[in-house]
């Protein structure tokens, strides 16, 4: 039987794993599913059609799965899906999707959301990302694996941030951030590649060199985007580390940050 504090309000229709924990004064709604080993602290609200996987930890005053902050939302049965091994610190808010897009807000595995961070409706967050304090992403944003969002940074709706990118503190991201890129400023502009992050994750010197060459083609050689994409795609034939960048640039979005 789940470890539920006597003051917690858990709807009988909620599905809570036998070894999950729900802290004092927390509220768990009828459509919620909580996986094995997940720990929900005191004063947490989990509501809506929300599925939370295994071994997550949710700290006090977080709000997970509530309706989106979107004028178009009309009460549709949209969802929030959270994977395994995530940490949500104090006052984190994660909102459900909308019928106008995916209908689901999705968070992968192994992510760390520090205090006061926000994930809006229909966002897709990958794996092993870090959202520093007060980082916020608007609706329909995609954050790929291993991204680091600096404190007080934000991403405009429909924006994309590619794998291993780093968004600096206070940065306002109005476009798409290519994989491996570091951006900062208001509005955010590119400032090289995330070399230190790549080293920490086991990339070799040769792989990092290929990433830097691709960045140079994209931003430093005065090439059109089409020509830069072609050059990077050609390099990727012998440098598979560039495959995520090739795939990212092939998808039309808000346009890459400049």
What kind of region is each of these model predictions?
Residues 3-189:
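Structural signal for interior beta-strand "rungs" in well-ordered beta-sheet cores
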Residues 1-7, 12-13, 18-19, 55, ...:
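Terminal amphipathic alpha-helical/low-complexity segments used for targeting or macromolecular assembly
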């Amino acid at each position: 039987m789940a470890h539920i504090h006597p003051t917690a309000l858990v709807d009988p229709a909620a599905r809570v794993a036998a070894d999950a924990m729900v802290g004092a004064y927390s509220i768990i709604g009828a459509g919620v599913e909580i996986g094995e080993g997940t720990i929900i602290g005191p004063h947490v609200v989990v509501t809506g059609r929300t599925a939370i996987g295994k071994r997550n930890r949710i700290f006090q005053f977080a709000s997970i799965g509530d309706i989106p902050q979107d004028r178009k939302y009309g009460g549709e049965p949209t969802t929030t899906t959270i994977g395994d091994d995530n940490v949500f610190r104090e006052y984190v808010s994660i909102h459900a999707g909308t019928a106008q897009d995916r209908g689901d807000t999705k968070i992968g595995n192994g992510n760390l959301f520090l205090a006061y961070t926000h994930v809006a409706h229909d966002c897709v967050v990958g794996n092993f990302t870090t959202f520093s304090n007060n980082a916020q992403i608007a609706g329909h944003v995609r954050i790929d694996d291993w991204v680091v969002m600096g404190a007080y940074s934000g991403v405009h709706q429909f924006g994309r941030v590619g794998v291993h990118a780093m968004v600096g503190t206070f940065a306002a991201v109005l476009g798409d951030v290519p994989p491996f890129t570091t951006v900062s400023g208001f509005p955010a502009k590119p400032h090289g590649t995330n070399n230190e992050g790549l080293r920490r994750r086991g990339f070799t010197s040769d792989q990092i060199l290929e990433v830097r060459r691709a960045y140079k083609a994209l931003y430093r050689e005065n090439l059109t985007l089409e020509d830069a994409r072609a050059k990077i795609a050609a390099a990727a034939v012998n440098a598979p580390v560039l495959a995520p960048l090739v795939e990212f640039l092939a998808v039309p979005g808000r346009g890459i940050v400049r």
